[in-house]
A protein has these predicted regions:
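Catalytic machinery of carbohydrate-active enzymes
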Residues: 1-175
Length: 175
């Protein structure tokens, strides 16, 4: 199809020096598989401010990641498990004035929040119903390993060199 919402797929996006919001509200194993993406994003955009939206119950997977500047959480199965709560989350995120939003998974909850968050550039993947709102849509290649699939989003956004150390876990100082 070639078209994805308001923009084209595989469009180079300026990431360095930008306020970037990465959204991912999936399960523990899936979240761990985003760590190469986070590292590669930081290497590609060393001067960016990178914020990550994750599920409250899984925040420890990303909380101490040195490649992130900030982690924001929602309690997706608890207090934030309603459309009103998701809209409130989108309003909170909108006030943070992000330049670029990158969604890594097309689940409905994350796609809904992303669709209603005011940002300058919305990219990555999304649920089909929200695709017309995306500036740069990056389809997920489900024929490759999930960690590589998330890295491929950066390739589609024009990142030429994907530097990372594979899967990484950064425990708190207590460990």
């Amino acid at each position: 199809s070639g078209k994805g919402g308001r923009g084209l797929m595989a469009q180079a996006v300026e990431l360095n020096g930008k306020k970037i919001l990465v959204t991912f509200l999936m399960h523990l194993g899936d979240l761990t598989l985003t760590t190469p993406f986070i590292h590669a994003l930081r290497k590609a955009a060393p001067d960016a401010h990178i914020t990550f939206l994750a599920d409250e119950k899984l925040k420890d997977v990303v909380l101490h990641n040195p490649y992130l500047d900030e982690v924001i959480t929602i309690d997706k199965k608890g207090k934030d498990n309603s459309l009103l709560a998701l809209m409130a989350c989108a309003r909170r995120l909108s006030k943070m004035d992000f330049d670029v939003l990158i969604n890594l998974h097309p689940n409905e909850r994350c796609s809904f929040i992303d669709a209603f968050t005011k940002v300058k550039l919305r990219c990555g993947t999304t649920h089909t119903m929200f695709k017309p709102l995306w500036d740069v849509f990056t389809p997920l290649n489900r024929k490759i390993h999930a960690a590589d699939m998330y890295l491929d989003v950066l390739t589609q956004l024009g990142v030429k060199k994907l530097e990372h150390n594979g899967l990484e876990i950064f425990p708190s100082e207590e460990y």
